[in-house]
């Protein structure tokens, strides 16, 4: 297996003979893959594809790619494994990035994104996080939560809730007592009738 400290260009130097022997049969497909991934330009692709000898084509391809730098060498090793149809441990460079244009293996510049360490705590996109009970628990956890909640509330609780919800009626203002009827004025007693003068005259006559 490729050494983690080994550069892609060093891997090509070490495995050059086996690469040339293995890639001769599918050199055209290898050229197509390198052109699609941006390693080769159009004129370079046309020049290599025009060579009639497959061995010479692969040898010139390896030299051309090594002259483009480590990013191109890295991409060549990836395309070589795919073109060969089976991964070869000798070509398995461990730090193969997602693409030639990304150049993720180069030393990062200050302020640029760097790959997260395995123990940094970041989760892969699409995987449920342990802190998410809905995703981590699955359907069983959701069923357990649903089974723990009562389906219908008790009637007593409903009655209490309805009482609390209804606003208390406001007390009616007390009516002021009607003013007491004024007492009717008392009638003055009629004076006694004066005695008739006949009796007085009789008394005077008796005295005389």
From Swiss-Prot:
It comes from the Eukaryota. Keywords: Apoptosis, Calcium, Cytoplasm, Disease variant, Lipoprotein, Membrane, Metal-binding, Mitochondrion, mRNA processing, mRNA splicing, Myristate, Nucleus, Phosphoprotein, Sarcoplasmic reticulum, Ubl conjugation. Residues 107-208 are annotated as: Disordered. GO terms for cellular component: cytoplasm; cytosol; membrane; mitochondrion; nucleolus; sarcoplasmic reticulum. PROSITE patterns: CARD. The keyword tRNA-binding does not apply. A lipid is attached at residue 2 (N-myristoyl glycine). Changing residue 68 to R: Abolished ubiquitination in response to an apoptotic stimulus. Phosphorylation at Thr-149 is required for its antiapoptotic effect by blocking death-inducing signaling complex death-inducing signaling complex (DISC) activity through the control of interaction with CASP8. Phosphorylation at Thr-149 results in translocation to mitochondria and this translocation enables the binding to CASP8. Dephosphorylated at Thr-149 by calcineurin; doesn't inhibit the association between FADD and CASP8 and the consequent apoptosis. Oligomerizes (via CARD doamin). Interacts (via CARD domain) with CASP2; inhibits CASP2 activity in a phosphorylation-dependent manner. Interacts with CASP8; decreases CASP8 activity in a mitochondria localization- and phosphorylation-dependent manner and this interaction is dissociated by calcium. Interacts with TFPT; translocates NOL3 into the nucleus and negatively regulated TFPT-induced cell death. CARD is critical for both extrinsic and intrinsic apoptotic pathways. CARD domain mediates a protective effect against myocardial ischemia/reperfusion, oxidative stress and TNF-induced necrosis. The C-terminal domain (amino acids 99 to 208) is involved in calcium binding and plays a protective role in calcium-mediated cell death. This is Nucleolar protein 3. It comes from Homo sapiens (Human). The lineage of its organism: Eukaryota, Metazoa, Chordata, Craniata, Vertebrata.
């Amino acid at each position: 297996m490729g050494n983690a400290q080994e550069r892609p260009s060093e891997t090509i130097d070490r495995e050059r003979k086996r690469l040339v022997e293995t890639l001769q049969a599918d050199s055209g497909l290898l050229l197509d893959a390198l052109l699609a991934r941006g390693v080769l330009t159009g004129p370079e692709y046309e020049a290599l594809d025009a060579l009639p000898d497959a061995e010479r084509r692969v040898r010139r391809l390896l030299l051309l790619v090594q002259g483009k730098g480590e990013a191109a060498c890295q991409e060549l090793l990836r395309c070589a494994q795919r073109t060969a149809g089976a991964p070869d441990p000798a070509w398995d460079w461990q730090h193969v990035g997602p693409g030639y244009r990304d150049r993720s293996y180069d030393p990062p510049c200050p302020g640029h994104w760097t790959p997260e360490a395995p123990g940094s705590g970041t989760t892969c996109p699409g995987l449920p996080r342990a802190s998410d009970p809905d995703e981590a628990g699955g359907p069983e956890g959701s069923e357990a939560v649903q089974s723990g909640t009562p389906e219908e509330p008790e009637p007593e609780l409903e009655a209490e809730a309805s009482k609390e919800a209804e606003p208390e009626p406001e007390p009616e203002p007390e009516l002021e007592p009607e003013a007491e009827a004024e007492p009717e004025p008392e009638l003055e007693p009629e004076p006694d009738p004066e005695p008739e003068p006949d009796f007085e005259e009789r008394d005077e006559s008796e005295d005389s």
